[in-house]
Amino acid sequence: MTGRTVTVVGAGLAGAEAAWQAARRGIKVKLYEMRPEKLTPAHRSGYFAELVCSNSLRAAALENAVGLLKEEMRHLDSLVMACADVTSVPAGGALAVDRDLFARCVTERIAGNPLIEICREEVTAIPEGEAVIIATGPLTSDALASDISRFTGENCLFFYDAVAPIVAAESINMGKVFRSSRYGKGEAAYLNCPLSREEYEVFWEALVKAEKAPRKEFEKELHFEGCMPVEVLAARGKETLLYGPMKPVGLIDPRTGRRPYAVVQLRQENAAATLFNMVGFQTGLKWDEQKRVFRLIPGLEEAEFVRFGVMHRNTFINSPVLLHPTFQTRKNPALFFAGQITGVEGYVESAASGLMAGINAARLLAGKEPLVFPRNTAHGSLAHYITAADPAHFQPMNINFGLFPPFEARIRDKKERYRTVAKKALESIDRFKETLL
């Protein structure tokens, strides 16, 4: 055990996991949590790792990327996964928990660790320290957010998600789309889904009648200037989208030699070209409605949505500019960020990022080199996405197999292919774990 201390700010899923991982390696931890003295608009208790939305940690099977991420966490002795497994409730093919028992489990184990000192107070500025992990989540307090903005620069801290859906490339019907940029300028960077007048009118009718996701009370005053939901634009008139995200100007369908009546553009989301973003289609529709309505677009009839559109309050940094894949900041290697504030999306992803940051902060204080997790693992792919994505278009993301390196072996059956990816990932995690001892 060293006499050095990791300071962790925020005891949500990421902060609790980070503190646990550092303490497991013999490092003292000061864990700051402002609740219950000061509650966020979403939290209701002072328990650590409180689940404020769903009680589901999503799919359990290894052929699902989040199922693999959870299994990797188990191999790495995750506190969050240990508590989730002992407080689970029946949920079919998913892992769901009794949220009160889960939060109590995490809190009690943290409180029972002699190396972790709990400080129930608000942190209003980035602390000085030998190693500091900021894990304050999407509802970071105003005072601390202001100081983070000072550190990152005002253009590198965002306060809401306005995200368009992302689809898996292999699910796009390439026979119905064409690759082109407007007016043929530059490289043909976009996939274009052309719509006839009749197809557009069917799509528009479905869009304006689709059911919107309810806003939480603390999100009702959000305004998304310059980033209007596509359904709000559509409601302004039948032709509004034709002058906005579905404008066809400068595009010629090579199969007809004519300009389509309307076009939906898909922009490549990652270097491997496995993911495509629906340009300008940020939306607040319910997820089932997004699937139903957007599959009316030619070429997207069988689209697999790896990320649905969302519009909600979410404080996060521009990680591709600010972070190394070790979760250290580029400006200060003793300062780490973890959790949703880094641009990972979801309970499990937040905890996994805390696990990586906690391990690396402990290594830093032990005089060891912080480590980048293997690229072919769910942990490594998540870290790679948030630090290597295009900074100009960076948006929070759930783990999905589109973030992994392209799989070289040709396996037609998708489930079998993903099971093979998972097997290799777990083998890599087990080898990697030996370097952490």
UniProtKB/Swiss-Prot annotation:
GO terms for molecular function: flavin adenine dinucleotide binding; tRNA (uracil(54)-C5)-methyltransferase activity, 5,10-methylenetetrahydrofolate-dependent. Keywords: Cytoplasm, FAD, Flavoprotein, Methyltransferase, NAD, NADP, Transferase, tRNA processing. Its main location: cytoplasm. It is found in: Cytoplasm. Pfam families: GIDA. Catalyzes the folate-dependent formation of 5-methyl-uridine at position 54 (M-5-U54) in all tRNAs. Belongs to the MnmG family. TrmFO subfamily. NCBIfam families: gid_trmFO (TIGR00137), PRK05335.1 (NF003739). PANTHER family: GLUCOSE INHIBITED DIVISION PROTEIN A, METHYLENETETRAHYDROFOLATE--TRNA-(URACIL-5-)-METHYLTRANSFERASE TRMFO. This is Methylenetetrahydrofolate--tRNA-(uracil-5-)-methyltransferase TrmFO.
